[in-house]
């Protein structure tokens, strides 16, 4: 499997009263931003079309490991992400249950929005809404959740990227 060179870039973000930092991982498939604060990683951002600013400092070790894991995942490797570095403080209780269900979907498998909703105790529409606000795409693999008719459904990185990720994991969509 070919490995790509990745560059880490620090971006400072002012969010309300909280100062956060973001490192970006540049990858041929998509650029990723990992945002963290005092309590851990607060968001993973798919950076398609986002203007980037550079600062050549090195990320903390936990962030570097997460970025390396994301790079390996995008290179097609099977990765067991360390979820302990993620800060779920911005998630509702229901969204956290949905994300817990989705984090257990193995590579090469999918669940429907209805199946996720049943396991999380909600409706398919509320599960889809919770996933549309997934703060940790790729690490919490919401791309593995599809519609009941076998179509991809939506994805914050775009349906084209969702299909590429699923194909990379060996999933072919029936409704396509």
Curated annotation (Swiss-Prot):
Catalysis performed (reactions): a 6-O-methyl-2'-deoxyguanosine in DNA + L-cysteinyl-[protein] = S-methyl-L-cysteinyl-[protein] + a 2'-deoxyguanosine in DNA; a 4-O-methyl-thymidine in DNA + L-cysteinyl-[protein] = a thymidine in DNA + S-methyl-L-cysteinyl-[protein]
Active site positions: 142 (nucleophile)
Entry keyword NAD: no
Record Pfam families: DNA_binding_1 (PF01035)
Compartments where found: Cytoplasm
Main location as per UniProt: cytoplasm
EC number: 2.1.1.63
SUPFAM superfamilies xref list: Methylated DNA-protein cysteine methyltransferase, C-terminal domain
Keyword rRNA processing among UniProt keywords: no
InterPro entries to which the protein is assigned, alphabetical: MethylDNA_cys_MeTrfase_AS, MethylDNA_cys_MeTrfase_DNA-bd, MethylDNA_cys_MeTrfase_DNAb, MGMT, WH-like_DNA-bd_sf
UniProt keyword list: Cytoplasm, DNA damage, DNA repair, Methyltransferase, Transferase
TM regions (residue ranges): none
GO BP term, pick one: methylation
Record's GO cellular component terms: cytoplasm
GO molecular function: methylated-DNA-[protein]-cysteine S-methyltransferase activity
PANTHER family in UniProt: METHYLATED-DNA--PROTEIN-CYSTEINE METHYLTRANSFERASE (PTHR10815:SF5)
Note: This enzyme catalyzes only one turnover and therefore is not strictly catalytic. According to one definition, an enzyme is a biocatalyst that acts repeatedly and over many reaction cycles.
Function: Involved in the cellular defense against the biological effects of O6-methylguanine (O6-MeG) and O4-methylthymine (O4-MeT) in DNA. Repairs the methylated nucleobase in DNA by stoichiometrically transferring the methyl group to a cysteine residue in the enzyme. This is a suicide reaction: the enzyme is irreversibly inactivated.
Family per record: Belongs to the MGMT family.
UniProt-recorded name of the protein: Methylated-DNA--protein-cysteine methyltransferase
Protein's gene: ogt
